[in-house]
Curated annotation (Swiss-Prot):
SMART domains: ZnF_C2H2 (SM00355). Residues 202-211, 593-604 have a biased composition (Basic residues). This is Transcriptional repressor CTCF. Residues 667-686 have a biased composition (Polar residues). Its main location: nucleus. It holds the Pfam family zf-C2H2_16. It comes from Mus musculus. There is a cross-link at K18, K219, K698 (Glycyl lysine isopeptide (Lys-Gly) (interchain with G-Cter in SUMO2)).
Length: 736
């Protein structure tokens, strides 16, 4: 069947191919259109055949990898179908020339293949029986070659004339028609009017297989055109593999669009620091961590950055790379050089306060100055309530707790906690050894000449723009005069409470005082429900009750050894302490009496004035307590005289007990004497109840008293005051 179909196609094509080519060329030259159908000799028994001409130059490459069936068809066409007379009449450029290259069946490189490229016009006759036959032959050859059934065949579109369609044929023979929207836009069809116009060839990469399909009268035929590349080694790529390659490709990086006039800045997430470079931000972030990777190999000190380590090493080696251009000074760091030039040469103050006219050379001093406006004191002592605006003053204050004295007098080797105190010591104690430089404008005496120049420049130089006093409206053009004027406001209590008579010198004290009126307690404990008006009280509460590692400070009295948690409490106790026995002196007794009298006075003021004097308790003033005589104990008669005992300090009289109504004031205030007592059981004759009576036993002299004395004693017992029973009366009752 295949051979008969091929012979019929070749016989019919031989007779009209040359004439058809000439007619088509003439019609295009004249602007005419091609006829829709060609009148060909038809055989009614075999069925009509229609021949469609594809007038284009196609480069065909014949290789050993082509299908054997197609090679056989081309061989038959070349051998037995062309007549000798037809070959002589047809031009050489219009004849299909096929050449078979026999190659060994072994793996060879693509570069060793010999390619034969012949431009041929392809004319394809279409028959009703040829489509099924070619499709069946193709499926048989695919099964013989052992190709994967799941591997689809790749189809690529080419610029096609009108009447053609692009289809995609799978491995199992399924045919899929591509829509017109999926194809690339075609060129304008006006090129058909000009026979000399040739459409531009489109460059395609790795075109493996293309299928052209056209239909006429319900008959369609697929034509495959193969194109092999020299660099391809593994055959045709499948459509699935192509999708995988596209899926694995990394998306392009988004381009950074920089807007003109906008400066890019980096901001720290932990504070308000901003910088124009990423490297500066990375260096700043190290300040929020304790990481110090760069270590000095000489002293072991660690630093956050290499620059700080390099500057530190210069201190070991004595290298000063930064030299001042205006003088002979040299410095370790560039910051020291800039600060030196501003102080000594340029006198530039770039950091200015936004609230007043203050300007500074260093930004740290500006921050400290701004805290004087806001009242902020972030640096607080952990041992007391002291708070400072800068770290320098806090360190100086901490020396009062630790006892450190880093400053030493070079003459007498006395040590001091502050440098100013040491300078004053030298000026006062060692005036003969110190050169004095007197200021011509004030009474200041300075030890060094350079310090005198600094003093004159800072204190007595004329300021064009006068400075205003921070406490009043006075304006001064000299800093020294301004400072002396502000000292007059030092002890002035400028801040006064609008709800009471309280006044203070500092604003922060007034803020804390007003909280006593409003009841505001903004500082709350995170572990309990306590709230406080001051942060110092909150910190003290937290350490005392919630910090397990807190050890309270112990202030020991040097006289008695008693410990206190506060220094002022210990100092007040030491003023009244008498010694290790814990007996307080005269000052202590007076202090306690005065405190008790003050409390009674405050209590008496709070009582209602409507109370009667009879019901009210008599209050004792301090004078009454002091004038009240102390009760003295009469000495007992001794039978034999004894030498007097050594003098002992007389203990102060104990405070009088509170008086009660209905009893004489004299008896309750008498101190109890330690005398021997005896318990006597007395039985009542009427009821028979037994009562225990405590009786004091007095020591009697060895000699028996006379009878007259007994009678006097019995008479004395009968005259007991207030009708109370005395031990003598009880004994006489028992005798009776």
């Amino acid at each position: 069947m295949e051979g008969e179909a091929v012979e019929a196609i070749v016989e019919e094509s031989e007779t009209f191919i040359k004439g058809k080519e000439r007619k088509t060329y003439q019609r295009r030259r004249e602007g005419g259109q091609e006829e829709d159908a060609c009148h060909l000799p038809q055989n009614q028994t075999d069925g009509g055949e229609v021949v469609q001409d594809v007038n284009s130059s196609v480069q065909m490459v014949m290789m050993e990898q082509l299908d054997p069936t197609l090679l056989q068809m081309k061989t038959e066409v070349m051998e037995g179908t062309v007549a000798p007379e037809a070959e002589a009449a047809v031009d050489d450029t219009q004849i299909i020339t096929l050449q078979v290259v026999n190659m060994e069946e072994q793996p060879i490189n693509i570069g060793e293949l010999q390619l034969v490229q012949v431009p041929v016009p392809v004319t394809v006759p279409v028959a009703t029986t040829s489509v099924e036959e070619l499709q069946g032959a193709y499926e048989n050859e695919v099964s013989k070659e052992g190709l994967a059934e799941s591997e689809p065949m790749i189809c690529h579109t080419l610029p096609l004339p009108e009447g053609f369609q692009v289809v995609k044929v799978g491995a199992n023979g399924e045919v899929e028609t591509l829509e017109q929207g999926e194809l690339p836009p075609q060129e304008d069809s006006s090129w058909q009017k000009d026979p000399d116009y040739q459409p531009p060839a489109k460059k395609t990469k790795k075109t493996k297989k293309s299928k052209l399909r056209y239909t006429e009268e319900g008959k369609d035929v697929d034509v495959s055109v193969y194109d092999f590349e020299e660099e391809q080694q593994e055959g045709l790529l499948s459509e699935v593999n192509a999708e995988k390659v596209v899926g694995n490709m990394k998306p392009p990086k988004p381009t950074k669009i920089k807007k003109k006039g906008v400066k890019k800045t980096f901001q720290c997430e932990l504070c308000s620091y901003t910088c124009p470079r990423r490297s500066n931000l990375d260096r700043h972030m190290k300040s929020h961590t304790d990481e110090r990777p760069h270590k000095c190999h000489l002293c072991g000190r660690a630093f956050r950055t290499v620059t700080l380590l390099r500057n530190h090493l210069n201190t070991h080696t004595g290298t000063r790379p930064h030299k001042c251009p205006d003088c002979d000074m040299a410095f370790v760091t560039s910051g020291e050089l800039v600060r030196h030039r501003r102080y000594k040469h340029t006198h530039e103050k770039p950091f200015k306060c936004s609230m007043c006219d203050y300007a500074s050379v260093e930004v740290s001093k500006l921050k400290r100055h701004i805290r004087s406006h806001t009242g902020e004191r972030p640096f607080q002592c952990s041992l007391c309530s002291y708070a400072s605006r800068d770290t320098y003053k806090l360190k100086r204050h901490m020396r009062t707790h630790s006892g450190e004295k880093p400053y030493e007098c070079y003459i007498c080797h006395a040590r001091f906690t502050q440098s100013g105190t040491m300078k004053m010591h030298i000026l006062q104690k060692h005036t003969e050894n110190v050169a004095k430089f007197h200021c011509p404008h004030c009474d200041t005496v300075i030890a060094r000449k350079s310090d005198l120049g600094v003093h004159l420049r800072k204190q007595h130089s004329y300021i064009e723009q006068g400075k205003k006093c921070r406490y009043c409206d006075a304006v001064f053009h000299e800093r020294y005069a301004l400072i002396q004027h502000q000292k007059s406001h030092k002890n002035e209590k400028r801040f006064k409470c609008d709800q009471c008579d309280y006044a203070c010198r500092q604003e922060r004290h007034m803020i804390m005082h007003k909280r006593t009126h409003t009841g505001e307690k903004p500082y709350a404990c995170s572990h309990c429900d306590k709230t406080f008006r001051q942060k110092q009280l909150l910190d003290m509460h937290f350490k005392r009750y919630h910090d397990p590692n807190f050890v309270p400070a112990a202030f020991v009295c040097s006289k008695c050894g008693k410990t206190f948690t506060r220094r002022n409490t210990m100092a007040r106790h030491a003023d009244n302490c008498a010694g290790p026995d814990g007996v307080e002196g005269e000052n202590g007794g007076e202090t306690k009496k005065s405190k008790r009298g003050r409390k009674r006075k405050m209590r008496s003021k709070k009582e209602d004035s409507s109370d009667s004097e009879e019901n009210a308790e008599p209050d004792l003033d301090d004078n009454e307590e002091e004038e009240e005589p102390a009760v003295e104990i009469e000495p007992e008669p001794e039978p034999q005289p004894q030498p007097p005992p050594p003098p002992q300090p007389v203990a102060p009289a104990p405070p009088p007990a509170k008086k009660r109504r209905g009893r004489p004031p004299g008896r309750t205030n008498q101190p109890k004497q330690n005398q021997p007592t005896a318990i006597i059981q007395v039985e009542d004759q009427n009821t028979g109840a037994i009562e225990n009576i405590i009786v004091e036993v007095k020591k009697e002299p060895d000699a028996e008293p006379a009878e007259g004395e007994e009678e006097e004693a019995q008479a004395a017992t009968t005259d007991a005051p207030n009708g109370d029973l005395t031990p003598e009366m009880i004994l006489s009752m028992m005798d009776r």
